[in-house]
Every structure is written in C-alpha cells, then in structure tokens.
C-alpha cells in the first residue's frame, strides 16, 4: 500500500473533503495531483533531480541577438585599440632610446678623433673632400628632419587613439542599459559569440605581428644607416689626415674654416635634440592634464570651506579676545570646516582670557601644532578647568608638551585626549605618569593606559589629588566657621564691658587732662584677655565623618548602646552590689517559699 492510496481512502471517507474536491476545476485537480504525487526514491537518480524543478521562470524580456553582437564587436575593438596604443608607445620609447645611444656614440667618436684633426689644422686639405663632408652633414640633417615628423605622427596617433577610446567609453556607458537587458543569452548563441571572439583575437594577433614587423625593419634600417654614416665619416677623416700629412701648411685660414664647420655641426645636433625633448615634455604634460581636470572642483570646494570657516568662527573669536563674560565655554566639537590655524587662533585668544572655563575641540583634526599652542596657553591661563582633545591627530610629543605645561598650571582639573590617530606608546605613558607626580590639581584624566604600571600609578595619583582637594575644602569650611565665630565675639565684647546704669554719661567735649592720664595707664596695665570663644562645631563634623566612614553594622551597634546609658533600678542595685564589700552587706533570712 502506497501513501497515495491511503490518502485517497481517507479523502473518500470524509464527506466534506469530497464536496470540496467536486467543486474544484480540472486544472486545479491536476495541480493538486502534482503536489500529492510522491515518487519512490531511486538510488540511481541524483538527489537534486528527484524533485520537480521549481525554479523555472519565464524570461523577463525578449532576447535581441543583433544588440549582443554589436556589443561584442565594440568591446573587441576597444581592446584592440588599447593594445595598439600600448605597443605604439613602447615603440616610440625604444626609438628615442636608440637615438640617444647613437648620439652618444657619435659624440664619443668625434671627441676621440677631435685631437687628431686639431693637430693637423695647419695643413691644407683638398676642396673636394670638404665639399663631400658638407654634403654628408646635410644628408644626415635631412634624414633626421624626416624622422621628426614620423615621431610626431606616431604621438598624434597615440593621442587620437586615447580620444577615440574615451568616446567609445561614453557611448558604451549610454548603451550599457540596453545591452544589459539583452545580455541574457542562450547556450547556442554564447557558443557562436565565443567563436567570433576567438576569430577577433586571432585578427588581433595578426595585426600585432604586422605592426611589430615594420617596426623591427625600421630599427634594422636605422642601425644600418647609422653604421654606414659612421664608417663614411671615419674613412673621410682618415683620407683627410693622409692628404694633410703629404702637403705642407700653406694657408692658415682654411683650418679656421674647418673649425667653424665643426661648430655649425654641433649647433645643428643641439637643435635636433631640443625638439625631441619638447615632444617628450608635451607627452608628459598631456598625460598629467587629464587627472588635473576632476581635481579642480575638489580644490574649489576645499577653498570654499576654508573661506566659510573664518566667517563662522569670527564672532566667538572676537568674544574670547574681548573677554566677554557670557562666553564661559568654547565648544567646537565635530566641526568639519575648522582648520588648525583657527584652533591656534582660539588658543592664542584664550591665553589672556579670564572667563572661559571649558575648551572642547574633539574630532577637529587637530595636530601637534595645536597641542603646542595649547601648552603655551595653559602656562599663562589660570581659569580653564576642562580641556577635551578626543579623536584628533595629536602624537605623543604634543601630549607630553601639554603635561609639561600642567606643572605650571594649578587650575585644570579635567583633561581628555582619548582615541587619537597615533598610538601614544609605553614610553609616553611612563613620561605622563612621571609628570603627573608633581601635579596636585588634575582630578579627571580621559585616557586608557595600555600598560598596567602607568595605569596604576596614575589612578593612585588622581586619588591623591582628590584627597588633597577634599582636605582643602574642609580647611576652608573651618576657617569660615572660625571667622564667623570671631565676628560674633567682637559683637558681644562691648556688652560685657558696658558702664552701669547709675554712672553719669560722658560729656561730648572731652577734657584735655584726661588724655595724658589715660595713656600711662594703658601703657602700664596690660589689656584684659578676650573671653574664650564658645565651643565650635567641628567635633560634630568629625563625628559625622566618622559615622559616614564606618560600616553600617558598627553604626547600628552604636545607636543601640546609646539609650542603655539610662540605668534601671535593677542595674543600680547590681552596680551597688559590685562596688560593695562583704563587710558592708547584711545577712538576710531566706524566705519561707525558698526554704
């Protein structure tokens, strides 16, 4: 019995299900049968193929074969153009290197043969030989002049290829959406496309070989021509030297003419090398110009932000400089347009400010220059109590400069410099711990020490500073209470030393004799000491402090003991018995109930 048969029996037994099935259309019945159809697993069929394919979907758009082929052709053309441009640039570089090497070789050969010709300057050469040398020089100049336009044409071709590649990229960007919609191809058409691409790649290889062959031929020709010209020059020079040796020096003017001809040849060569350098420089500038285009708007934005920043921070800067009483806090946290120059100006303005107590510049890209300016400001400023330097670019040098300035500052109580771009390191942490030993006012330090040693020492130093601040507060309270008690005593002293009611009132005009009599009495008799002040409240404060520092259990025990001081009659009797002797006690008869 299969599962389907069992399910059908259950369905037939249930009348409600039968009625539901009767209402279904034939299409719905087919779907239901497909879902209920359970096939026994076959071991020979892979697991992924045992179920029916539930991922079959209809194509979202129609396939355009022509668009696909056009796209493949454009892409192959772009690749060919890129490779051609790269090959041409390499060939131009090789040609220029070969020319430079030939020029160096010719210059060296001329230098070697120069002293021989100079030694034979006084001798008279033939006119035909001179004409031949001039004609050869002209031919070399003409050949080099013809090579220049060739190189310029090659460079122009490279630039044209780059322009075409840029235009093709723009066209490809416009047509990209249409081509992406048509990119869903079938397997057969993919095969045809791959075959065509293979054919195009073969065409590319052929073109490369064709381009390389003429380039190699040109290089071989150039080397052969250079060798032939060098050989001709050497032969002509040898002939001239032989003829000069045979003849005697008759005229000296001819030697001067040969020198002038050499100078002219050198000038011509220099002029030929200069345009080559100019062509190279133009190529470099063209390569550098394209990236400079998109950088212009970014430079303009940066300049606009720098110009806008001073306008935003001008008012607070003026308030800080003018010591405005309302300006008690300078907060420039997370400002994008602020620069290090503006931060330095703020610190310079705060140097002589006596109102601002909080200076916060977190996440403002402040560097060591700002840190050094803050250190100078802390040495002079005696009002700032909080400084926030979180999330900046300050290094260990700037932080140590700030801590050295704290040795001369006794007002800063909070300093935060966590999450800097550069890690402080163990050395700076040790230096911070050493410098904090001499500071007694810093109470809060916003930094997580990586080393355990400096971390423990700094926590102990901060707790020490907290205790010192608490002791100072207590002393100030005592002094204030003592001052208030002295004022009360001064007010009560005249009442004690007042005259009795029956004594006559002194006259408004004092007698002249009374002054000299009173002065010796005051000098001889010591003044009466002031009465002792009343008991002060500090003991109560100390008791409260003791209670606050003692644990709760001891306080409860103490509270319970206090009411026990009032003794009952029984306690009094027991105390009397303990203090009495046996002689004082009287014998008492035992009561009858206890007998």
UniProtKB/Swiss-Prot annotation:
Which GO annotations describe the biological process of this protein?
A: actin filament organization; actin nucleation; muscle contraction; myofibril assembly; pointed-end actin filament capping; positive regulation of actin filament polymerization
Compositional bias, Pro residues, is annotated for 503-513, 527-538
Instruction: Give a yes or no for keyword Phosphoprotein in this entry.
Output: yes
Which compartments does it reside in?
A: Cytoplasm, Myofibril, Sarcomere; Cytoplasm, Cytoskeleton
Q: Where is there biased composition of kind Basic and acidic residues? A: 72-105, 117-127, 134-193, 201-224, 232-251, 259-289, 467-476, 484-493
A Pfam match is WH2
Coiled-coil features, chain-numbered ranges: none
The protein depicted here goes by the name: Leiomodin-1
Q: Which organism is it from?
A: Rattus norvegicus
Task: Name the encoding gene, please.
Answer: Lmod1
